[in-house]
Structure formats: structure tokens, C-alpha cells
Amino acid sequence: VKSRVVSLLLYYPATLIIVAVGTIMATVLPSYYALIPELVLSLAFVYLLARLRRGLGIGYLYVVVILIIVLISFASVFIIRPGIILNKALTEMRQNVIKGFTYIIVYLFASLLPDSATDLVGTLPIFILVTAVAILEFRLRYYLLAGVVTGVLGIGVSTVVLSMIYDRLVVTYGLSATTMGLMGSILTASFMGLIKGPRRFVHLLNFLLTLYTVYESLWLLIPIPPVLIIDGVGINRLGHFASFLAGLIIAIFITQKTNLALNE
């Protein structure tokens, strides 16, 4: 118990400092110049997890998964480019339905990754904060379930559909597919933990931090209009809302299943 308390006393302030510095960097530096300091801050967060993992009650696998997500996200800016995959899918659908559908399947998973330096730099601090809270609320498999499944179903599918309806490429912001699903799920999980779970003070802090991330992301979560056009670019607001809502719902089942496992 003492080890966990000490770890949490180090964990919360250190995470908030990393997020605050990342937010400042994203605000004052051009996107590509901010990539290096953002990468350093992300690795600092991973290092923090590795050092405090026992006190936080997580294993090395959890830390490795977060590291992989960070590295793939940075690589995506230069290599994967989900928007290009979607554009290719829409083009192929007009010529070869099977090939176009294959590209769409690939895009559904690629949609979890950032499409540009601006996307990554703009959303990474919020992703780190949401992940920091999720680690305290969910086991690894539920973290992946809440982030990946809600992201693919909410943002990935809606982006494909809206791009076809609007006949233009509709984009999402950075890691928002994963972030929005996690945000909704930990909002529900921390609230339920606050009401009937142990460690209520931790759940309270997690709930308040998640409310802050919701506030910061509010302009993306309002689904009207479903596609917001800024400088000729269509932004998928409906998908962000759908992922967030899916996260809210899926957390109810995750929390119930966790409680049943603890009672057995």
C-alpha cells in the first residue's frame, strides 16, 4: 500500500508536467519542429511508467504496448499516412470494388494513427493524459479494447461513410480515434469506481482529469455538423462523438466484468 501511494504521488505530478510542457511545445513551435520535443516527452512518460510500474500495478507488457503505440504514431506521420490510404480506397472503389474494399479494411486500422505532424503534435498531450488515467482504471486488454475497437467502429467506419457521402476526403485528428474511445470509457469507469469501488480518491482524480480532457476536446465531440469544413478540409466530428459514446457504453461492460472477476 505504501509503495502504491508513493508511486501515485510521483505519477500524477510528473504526468501533468509532461502534458503541460507538451501542450506548450505544441502551441509555440511549428508542427515539425515540435516533433522531437514531443517524442522526448512521450519517451519520458514511457520511462516513468517503467520505473513506477510495480507501484501502479502494471507489467512490462503494458509499458511496451504504450511504447509501440508512440513509436508507430510518429512513424505514421512520415510512412503510413492514413489519409493517403483512404484516398486510394475511394479511388479504387470506383474501378475495382474488391481492391477498394481491401484498402478500406486496411484504413480502418490505419485510422487509429495520425495523418500529419500537426495532427500528432496537437493531440499527443491529451493522449498521454488519457492513457495515464486509463492505466489506473483498466487492465491492458481492456485498454486495447476501449481504444482500438471504439476507434475503428466510431471514427474509422464513419470516416469511410462520410467520405463517400460528401464525395471528399474526410479526416480525423491525430490519435483521436484511440483517445476519444478511451476518454469515454475512463469517464464511465472512474465515475462508477467513485460511487462503489475502493480507492475512491484515485477514481475522483481520474474522473476530474478526464472531465478536463473532455472540455479540451469539446469542439471535436459536438457532432453537428457531422463534417466541419476548415480551409477546404473536412473534419469528422460525428466519428469523434461516436467513438466517445462507444467508450462510455463499453466501459459499463468492462467494469461489470472486472467486478465479477474480483468477486469470484
Language model feature labels by segment:
Residues 3-263:
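A detector for small-residue-rich transmembrane helices and their helix-helix packing motifs
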